[in-house]
Amino acid sequence: MSYTPQQHRVNKKLGECLAIANQHFSREFPCPTVTYKLRGKAAGKAYLQLNEIKLNQVLFSENEDAFINEVVPHELAHLITHQVFGRVRPHGNEWKYVMEKVFNVPARTTHSLEITSVQGKTFEYRCDCTTYPLSIRRHNKVIRNQSTYRCQQCQQTLAFTGLQLS
């Protein structure tokens, strides 16, 4: 299998982080499988039982350095945490420990990447005080009478304006 330069950088960062974790915990962690088929707004996702990391190729291409320095250690920390501590909260103290004390990376639970290119369709909803963009999934739930959404300030039920934003 041939790797792109981006994928080489991911593998190199994984190797570096694994070596640090191996030394810190005095054990050998298996190298996870990495795939680039994650869709939507998530940057990455760790599959604990499979020892696999899925990365969002579109967001990766647009934010390569952030992925290498933040997303790859973040997802690997989930796998390491699971293998060392077992079943714990996804972003709990054990995960924070691996991020900050082992990998020396700030323990952020969400990314701040620009997601316009992967966002999908959004629809405008409003109440008396403001407007909200709702995803196509939430919009469809409203249309099918499966859900309603309320304003965070005035608690009024949001109503579709008829406008598709993107």
From Swiss-Prot:
Cofactor descriptive note: Binds 1 zinc ion.
Cofactor annotation: Zn(2+)
Single GO term (MF): zinc ion binding
Record GO cellular component, one term: cytoplasm
Domain SprT-like, chain residue ranges per copy: 21-160
Keywords: Cytoplasm, Metal-binding, Zinc
GO biological process assignments: response to stress
Predominant cellular place of this UniProt entry's protein: cytoplasm
Active site residues per record: 75
Record: residues binding Zn(2+): 74, 78
Subcellular location(s) per record: Cytoplasm
Membership in a protein family: Belongs to the SprT family.
Matching NCBIfam families: PRK04860.1
UniProt cross-references to HAMAP family, sorted A to Z: SprT
Name of the protein described by the UniProt record: Protein SprT
Protein source organism: Vibrio atlanticus (strain LGP32)
